[in-house]
């Protein structure tokens, strides 16, 4: 199991304030604490306007790398920002995320293909989160085909099945159980 520290996200009010105020100490402290707690990757998500996102990601990534060697998880809804942030990282990390929605997978996979970068893959497409096991498996296989096309080993992908909560969808548990049952073990890939 991998643990992704998610406390360096501009959608968190205290982090948003630190970004706006250029409070380097808060960013460093959050990075240090998550690394000490055993995070495998530290997710860095600026959650700012796209015209300043890349420079904000660079600032945050540089601060994180001053205090820890824990690999970075580059996180943005923008493929352009993710791709631009990869060179700021001192070592390969994780891109969060691709799916079959839009063209993000075709913009990120070529960049990480010949590297040791890993990637979170969300099981959704242009129709949203699949509501059946069959549709989720179709999306899963589509992502795996794209990975194969770009020469990305399955072991470099971390599949997020996007399980919806039981409080919003009573079939959620059944869908997740079926996904687990029908998915090949990583050892079998």
Model-derived segments and their meaning:
Residues 34, 85, 159:
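Conserved, mostly hydrophobic/aromatic
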Residues 102-168:
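Conserved anion-binding
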């Amino acid at each position: 199991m991998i643990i992704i520290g998610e406390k360096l996200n501009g959608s968190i009010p205290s982090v948003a304030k630190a970004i706006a105020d250029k409070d380097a100490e808060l960013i460093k402290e959050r990075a240090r604490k998550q690394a000490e707690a055993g995070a495998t990757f530290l997710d860095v998500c600026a959650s700012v306007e796209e015209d300043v996102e890349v420079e904000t990601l660079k600032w945050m990534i540089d601060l994180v790398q001053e205090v820890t060697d824990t690999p970075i998880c580059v996180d943005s809804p923008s493929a352009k920002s993710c791709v631009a942030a990869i060179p700021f990282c001192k070592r390969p990390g994780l891109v969060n995320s691709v799916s079959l929605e839009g063209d993000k997978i075709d913009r990120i996979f070529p960049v990480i293909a010949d590297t040791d970068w890993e990637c979170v893959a969300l099981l959704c497409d242009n129709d949203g989160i699949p509501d059946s096991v069959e549709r989720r498996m179709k999306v899963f296989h589509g992502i795996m085909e794209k990975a194969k096309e770009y020469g990305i080993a399955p072991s470099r992908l971390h599949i997020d099945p996007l399980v919806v909560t039981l409080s919003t969808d009573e079939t959620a548990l059944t869908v997740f159980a079926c996904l687990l049952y029908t998915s090949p073990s990583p050892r079998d890939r």
